[in-house]
């Protein structure tokens, strides 16, 4: 049972491994002990020998084999490190490599996270924890499903006229929509958008949640949404 990057490592090196950060997203890792949870494996009926060995993200876990070198053009013997999960790599990419630093990602989805010396176990289960690329740190996280995806949905479903206009002007539709949104006063005239197009995760996990606009009125203009 391998994550995507771990399968790539296997093809390059022949080693069946993963790192703590990616493993922490499987819900099978005891993140405080940095080992697979015997209790959870037993609960789900998963044999331990089906799971990869665990290493820190920066650990060299193998070298590129002769076969992989022939198939990829890479140099045989090149060291390969365990790497990290996407969220934990984004954390380091944002410069969050010390306790107390925070960051926000706005992509297709979005999340807010921080580097912490210990995991934050929320009794209401609104958030979750990754292991940081630095195995001495954690990244408690709250995440939403449709951030940039909401913007794309609005462009595709509600902005046919703007798409044509942007094409005529030779600019990206998002650039035109940005100019339009800048004309709306702060607060968008009281219009509120709930971005639950794909259900929602934090703070109340609900796959059946659906999005809506709240506060529509006769004074609402296209620039507001």
Region spans (language model):
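Short beta-strands and strand-loop turn motifs
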Residues: 19-22, 48
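Active-site core segments that coordinate phosphate-bearing ligands/cofactors
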Residues: 2-18, 27-38, 42-45, 60, ...
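A generic secondary-structure micro-motif detector
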Residues: 26-27, 54
């Amino acid at each position: 049972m391998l994550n995507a990057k771990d399968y790539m490592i296997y093809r390059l090196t022949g080693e069946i491994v993963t790192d703590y950060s990616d493993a922490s997203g499987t819900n099978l890792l005891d993140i405080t002990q940095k080992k697979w949870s015997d209790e959870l494996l037993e609960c789900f009926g998963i044999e331990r020998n089906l799971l990869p060995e665990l290493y820190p993200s920066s650990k060299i876990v193998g070298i590129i084999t002769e076969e992989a070198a022939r198939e990829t053009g890479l140099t045989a013997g090149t060291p390969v490190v365990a790497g990290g999960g996407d969220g934990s790599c984004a954390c380091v990419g944002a410069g969050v490599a010390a306790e107390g630093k925070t960051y926000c990602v706005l992509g297709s989805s979005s999340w807010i996270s921080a580097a912490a010396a210990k995991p934050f176990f929320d009794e209401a289960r609104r958030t979750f924890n990754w292991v940081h690329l630095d195995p001495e740190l954690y990244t408690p996280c709250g995440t939403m499903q449709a951030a940039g995806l909401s913007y794309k949905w609005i462009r595709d479903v509600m902005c046919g006229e703007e798409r044509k206009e942007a094409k005529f002007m030779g600019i990206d539709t998002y650039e035109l929509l940005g100019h339009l949104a800048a004309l709306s006063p702060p607060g968008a005239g009281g219009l509120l958008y709930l971005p639950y197009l794909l259900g929602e995760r934090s703070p109340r996990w609900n796959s059946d949640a659906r999005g809506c606009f709240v506060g529509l009125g006769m004074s609402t203009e296209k620039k507001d949404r």
